[in-house]
Amino acid sequence: MEKDRGEIFRKEIENLLKGKDIPVKTDQLGNYSIRFKSKTGKKVIAIFAHLDEIGGTVRNIKKNGRLEFSRRGGYEGRWLVSRTVEILNKEGDWIKGVIAGRASHSTPEKLRVSEKFDPLEMEIYLGASNKREVLSDYKIHVGAPIVFSGEFGLLNPKVNNNVIAGYSMDNLTALTCLVVLTQKIAKNLLDDFGCIMSSHDVCIVATAREEIGTEGAFFFAKNNQIDEVIGIDIGIVEDISGSVHSGIKLNKGPVIVWQESFGTGVLDYKLCMNLTKVAELNKMPFQNGVFEFYGSDAGKAQKWLGIPSALIGIPTMFSHNVPEISTLTGIESAAELIFQYLKNFE
């Protein structure tokens, strides 16, 4: 879950900053952060990427041993049937389950074309025969967290060393980008004393609870003096007929997001334009995006706290599904764009 992923993030950052007096800090909501201090500290820029992933929570244990669940984060029921999940039991072990659904062999034609799948009506099969087994043998309780099960890595490593696939690309891609960005800063922008050679401080923040309301980013931004936010998240790649999209391509560079959340999340125009100029000056490919069914840490900081905020998306296909598809070059190019912005920020 978030804490385990946060501790992995901590170790990666600490390895990059060995010998530097730059501690990784945590707060009450589970955010992990470091601060690169400048000599003047005129401004503070925070770079956000979230730790959490979509999942669920056990809502009810039925007499027949199946589990009913509620969602964590936004996703649809239509792709859930036969997906493998893992449930954290009270002893800290992960128990595998499969989301149940009617088999094709027993589904009449009229339901095949018209049936809607509501996650609230779906069940998870564990192998238990009754409720007692779930409680005593599997040691699962109401309130237990659920995550989708899967692996991640190169999709076809023998023929393609760029395209990656797996669960939770939202937001493992952005977290990886945050680590790559930290590496670039540590290697190129720090002096012998560990100060960033800039007029501004930079906070690197792995945020908690984004998928359930961008709570971690809001908490961090509200409790720290932040002058500017750049969020890193996925950029929606979509070309299926009937979908709403901005024509983003998987291999055409990072996405500068101008608007999200049905038009209620408008990112800072000046900051977005500045990122555009940085990309153009450095001859870096980039894309422009507007996302409707989508919200982010950056959008929350902009809307609710009035902090000038921008969002960089790493092109990703099949978002909030398992697996999701992204690229290693997408991660690297997003990190490079933000690095060049920080390097030239005034």
Predicted features along the sequence, with ranges:
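N-terminal hydrophobic/helix-forming segments and targeting peptides
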Residues: 1-346
